[in-house]
Amino acid sequence: MLARFPLYLRLIRMDKPIGSLLLLWPTLNALWIASDGHPAPSLVVIFVLGTLLMRSAGCAINDYADRDFDRHVKRTAERPLTSGKIRAWEAVAIAVGLALVSFLLILPLNALTKELSVVAVFVAATYPFMKRFFAIPQAYLGIAFGFGIPMAFAAVQDTVPALAWMLLAANVFWSVAYDTAYAMVDRDDDLKIGMRTSAITFGRYDVLAIMLCYAAMLGIYVWVGVTQHFGWPYWAGWAAAAGCSIYHYTLIKDRERMACFAAFRHNNWLGGALFAGIAAHYALSAL
């Protein structure tokens, strides 16, 4: 069992934290905004751990769902499940176990948060299968990656206001942007095996679609800043995030595989800039 532990860590992408960070930033944004910059430490711990656990569970179930496809994709052919180093039932067991631990974390929270968690688990578990049917599965991914947003508002305010759904919409646009760049890396392989991705759907308009999604996401955050009366620290963070999106254009415009992958990874800085602006606004407002 101990000898297989490194394989399990690879299955849940513990060696690749970028996915966890892309989930974490929008969740932290929601926690800070919902609590006016003063989230309870216990809530921060619960949502950070829950995000990490559910992302790991999602990786395991994704590899289970895609195991017959991944062996035909250069980037994924050596994943533990695809290469036969672990079995399908092990991946399912790990995913279920991580989801159960994540649910245990929210037991102290209110009923609305628990109800939303059921929806969150359903969306996360079904996302890998959406790639067979949806032309832009990355939009579904945005809902799965962003469901911590309404849950955060529910945990703090015991309601989910329109603001939370706007933040979730922003996350959908952001997810389509960064995951389309990611899908551009695998586009040739995905075309051969019949996988549906936004990079394939957008075709020669892929770069334009990515930049429009960035613009939509940043536009929603302008609305958030105006309606919440955020100060200059927020707008500095917003400007840094906008600068990141422009930098990503320079990486993806020639559609070179490794540059597209670099753009995907760099979205961590875009998300971090927005959260830094939100946190700094509340911190300075409290002085």
From Swiss-Prot:
Localization, UniProt: Cell inner membrane
Transferase as UniProt keyword: yes
GO cellular component, one term: plasma membrane
Topology term for the membrane: Multi-pass membrane protein
Annotated Pfam families: UbiA (PF01040)
Residue spans crossing the bilayer: 30-50, 92-112, 133-153, 158-178, 207-227, 232-252, 267-287
Names of the cofactor(s): Mg(2+)
GO biological process entries: ubiquinone biosynthetic process
Tagged with keyword Cell membrane: yes
Protein name in the entry: 4-hydroxybenzoate octaprenyltransferase
Family: Belongs to the UbiA prenyltransferase family.
InterPro entries: HB_polyprenyltransferase-like, Prenyltransferase, UbiA_prenyltransferase, UbiA_prenylTrfase_CS, UbiA_sf
Top EC class for this record: transferase
Organism for this UniProt entry: Burkholderia thailandensis (strain ATCC 700388 / DSM 13276 / CCUG 48851 / CIP 106301 / E264)
Gene3D superfamilies: UbiA prenyltransferase
GO molecular function: 4-hydroxybenzoate polyprenyltransferase activity
Keyword terms of this UniProt record: Cell inner membrane, Cell membrane, Magnesium, Membrane, Transferase, Transmembrane, Transmembrane helix, Ubiquinone biosynthesis
EC number(s) recorded for this UniProt protein: 2.5.1.39
Function in brief: Catalyzes the prenylation of para-hydroxybenzoate (PHB) with an all-trans polyprenyl group. Mediates the second step in the final reaction sequence of ubiquinone-8 (UQ-8) biosynthesis, which is the condensation of the polyisoprenoid side chain with PHB, generating the first membrane-bound Q intermediate 3-octaprenyl-4-hydroxybenzoate.
Catalysed reactions, semicolon-separated: all-trans-octaprenyl diphosphate + 4-hydroxybenzoate = 4-hydroxy-3-(all-trans-octaprenyl)benzoate + diphosphate
Pathway assignment: Cofactor biosynthesis; ubiquinone biosynthesis
